[in-house]
């Protein structure tokens, strides 16, 4: 059953999160898996392991919402110019464990970046994708009854300043980077398509082949 891809454009975080929960609660064994491609207005989100100390006082003074979510991980920032893909899978049907899903998501991002001549890797101690030790993509998932939602966020061509007001993903001293630091005037729409293709190849290789 091929993955269904939905391009949602710029959407508020909370309503998108509610839609993911609703989709996951209502889906049946026959519901196709979906990938949602989206951007959000500026927002800080706290994962289930998030700590208040990772939000600096300056961040609290900004006119940016801070939302406690049900995904794994700690605090991060979303904003325009970031490619976000929410991964809504039936893990039992796909015969995927959570660690395998994370690994495949990371591998898809790494392969996509490699095609742009950006050398990236993953870390066993901190999920995500890194370029020369700087974080370029973050991952966070929620698994409910063997169904996944939330997903990945790739920094593409955005204002990274709000990341300096937090401790991203709880990683002290981590620096953030983005695709536009390595490529002049990158094409976001074309890159969304290429990243989706890489993700589909990793999640459904038998269909993609």
UniProtKB/Swiss-Prot annotation:
Q: Which residues form the active site?
A: 169
Q: Which InterPro entries would you find in this protein's record?
A: aa-tRNA-synth_II/BPL/LPL (IPR045864), BPL_LPL_catalytic (IPR004143), Octanoyltransferase (IPR000544), Octanoyltransferase_CS (IPR020605)
Keyword vocabulary terms for this entry = Acyltransferase, Cytoplasm, Transferase
Question: What else does UniProt say about it?
Answer: In the reaction, the free carboxyl group of octanoic acid is attached via an amide linkage to the epsilon-amino group of a specific lysine residue of lipoyl domains of lipoate-dependent enzymes.
Q: Which reaction does it catalyse?
A: octanoyl-[ACP] + L-lysyl-[protein] = N(6)-octanoyl-L-lysyl-[protein] + holo-[ACP] + H(+)
Record localization = Cytoplasm
Which GO terms of type biological process are on file?
A: protein modification process
Instruction: Show the taxonomic lineage.
Output: Bacteria, Pseudomonadati, Pseudomonadota, Gammaproteobacteria, Thiotrichales
Q: What does this protein do?
A: Catalyzes the transfer of endogenously produced octanoic acid from octanoyl-acyl-carrier-protein onto the lipoyl domains of lipoate-dependent enzymes. Lipoyl-ACP can also act as a substrate although octanoyl-ACP is likely to be the physiological substrate.
Q: What is the name of this protein?
A: Octanoyltransferase
Give one Pfam hit by family name. LplA-B_cat
- Which pathway does this chain act in? Protein modification; protein lipoylation via endogenous pathway; protein N(6)-(lipoyl)lysine from octanoyl-[acyl-carrier-protein]: step 1/2
State where substrate binds: 71-78, 138-140, 151-153
Identify the species of origin.
Hydrogenovibrio crunogenus (strain DSM 25203 / XCL-2) (Thiomicrospira crunogena)
Q: Name one GO molecular function term.
A: lipoyl(octanoyl) transferase activity
How would you classify this enzyme at the top EC level? transferase
This protein's GO cellular component annotations are: cytoplasm
Source domain of life: Bacteria
Among CDD domains, the record links this protein to:
LipB
Question: Which residues are marked as site: Lowers pKa of active site Cys?
Answer: 135
Q: Where are the transmembrane segments?
A: none
Family recorded in the similarity comment: Belongs to the LipB family.
């Amino acid at each position: 059953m091929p993955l269904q891809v939905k391009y949602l454009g710029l959407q508020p975080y909370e309503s998108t999160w509610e839609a993911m929960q609703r989709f996951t609660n209502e889906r049946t064994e026959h519901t196709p898996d979906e990938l949602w491609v989206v951007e959000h207005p500026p927002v800080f989100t706290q994962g289930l392991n998030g700590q208040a100390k990772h939000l600096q006082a300056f961040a609290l003074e900004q006119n940016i919402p801070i939302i406690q979510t049900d995904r794994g991980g700690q605090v991060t920032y979303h904003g325009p110019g970031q490619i976000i893909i929410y991964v809504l899978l039936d893990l039992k049907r796909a015969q995927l464990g959570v660690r395998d899903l994370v690994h495949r998501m990371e591998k898809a991002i790494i392969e996509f970046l490699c095609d742009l001549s950006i050398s990236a890797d993953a870390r066993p101690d901190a999920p995500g994708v890194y370029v020369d030790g700087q974080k370029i993509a973050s991952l966070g998932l929620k698994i409910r009854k063997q169904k996944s939602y939330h997903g990945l966020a790739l920094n593409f061509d955005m204002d990274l300043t709000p990341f300096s007001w937090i401790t991203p993903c709880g990683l002290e001293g981590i620096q953030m980077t983005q695709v536009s630091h390595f490529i002049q005037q990158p094409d976001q729409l074309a890159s969304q398509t290429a990243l989706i293709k890489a993700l589909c190849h990793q999640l459904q290789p038998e269909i993609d082949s």
